[in-house]
């Protein structure tokens, strides 16, 4: 690892966690640059560029997060944050614990290093179904991690059936799985939620809304 680790940061902002196990929780978000997955429905396509944003040191990032005065929970997101492993992500996650619990949002394509895992409280994992338009690997590490919670982006009953097959294939505990409506606007969110409602009930899956989409659409920094 670098003696003075630096990562590329797109934005640091305070908001509510809009999805998943920490739904509605006030948090500081640290968005890192770069994603090799590139799902067709991605709502942060500006994060794909590995050279976007600005290079920042760990201490600088922590100081900016602290200045937002929202302490207790930090979400490291992207992009795909785990591409920064062994290039500063481990040091960043451990340093951010000064603010509270640390949640890492990931596609699940890459397993964490032991150094990273020690400093993460929650993995917010979003494995890619066929509706993503890409083929992405999935690390079995997350299926057995007590820190991992899963969000599947779904638009219809067929997507929910694919989630069922995925969960069974990897032995993922059903109680750790959330279905999440595919949407970029409040109107799309409501429509997708209605389409998946009955399938979620039949499959015994929890559903997470996307609060930021419901309130702000696809606005950046929310």
Curated annotation (Swiss-Prot):
Pathway: Purine metabolism; 7-cyano-7-deazaguanine biosynthesis. Its EC number is 4.3.99.3. [4Fe-4S] cluster binds at residues 35, 39, 42. Its cofactor is [4Fe-4S] cluster; S-adenosyl-L-methionine; Mg(2+). Binds 1 [4Fe-4S] cluster. The cluster is coordinated with 3 cysteines and an exchangeable S-adenosyl-L-methionine. PROSITE patterns: RADICAL_SAM (PS51918). Residues 22-222 form the Radical SAM core domain. Mg(2+) binds at residue 44. Substrate binds at residues 16-18, 31, 77. Disulfide bonds: none annotated. One of its GO terms (molecular function) is S-adenosyl-L-methionine binding. Keywords: 4Fe-4S, Iron, Iron-sulfur, Lyase, Magnesium, Metal-binding, S-adenosyl-L-methionine. It comes from the Archaea. It catalyses: 6-carboxy-5,6,7,8-tetrahydropterin + H(+) = 7-carboxy-7-deazaguanine + NH4(+). Catalyzes the complex heterocyclic radical-mediated conversion of 6-carboxy-5,6,7,8-tetrahydropterin (CPH4) to 7-carboxy-7-deazaguanine (CDG), a step common to the biosynthetic pathways of all 7-deazapurine-containing compounds. This is 7-carboxy-7-deazaguanine synthase.
């Amino acid at each position: 690892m670098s003696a003075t680790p630096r990562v590329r940061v797109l934005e640091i902002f305070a908001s509510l966690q809009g999805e998943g196990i920490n739904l509605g929780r006030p948090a500081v978000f640290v968005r890192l640059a770069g994603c090799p997955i590139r799902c067709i429905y991605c709502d942060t396509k500006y994060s794909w560029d590995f050279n976007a944003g600005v290079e920042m040191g760990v201490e600088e990032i922590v100081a900016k997060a602290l200045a937002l005065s929202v302490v207790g929970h930090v979400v490291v997101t992207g992009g795909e944050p785990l591409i920064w492993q062994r290039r500063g992500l481990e040091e960043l996650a451990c340093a951010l614990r000064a603010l509270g619990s640390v949640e890492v949002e990931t596609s699940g394509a890459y397993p964490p290093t032991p150094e990273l895992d020690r400093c993460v409280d929650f993995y917010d994992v979003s494995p890619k179904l066929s509706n993503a338009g890409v083929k992405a690997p999935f690390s079995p590490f997350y299926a057995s991690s007590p820190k991992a919670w899963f969000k599947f982006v779904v638009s219809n009953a067929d997507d929910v059936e694919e989630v069922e097959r995925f969960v069974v294939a990897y032995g993922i505990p059903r109680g750790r799985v959330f279905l999440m409506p595919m949407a970029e606007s409040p109107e799309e969110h409501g429509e997708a939620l209605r389409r998946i409602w009955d399938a979620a009930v039949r499959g015994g899956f929890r559903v997470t809304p996307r609060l930021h989409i419901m309130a702000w659409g696809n606005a950046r920094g929310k």
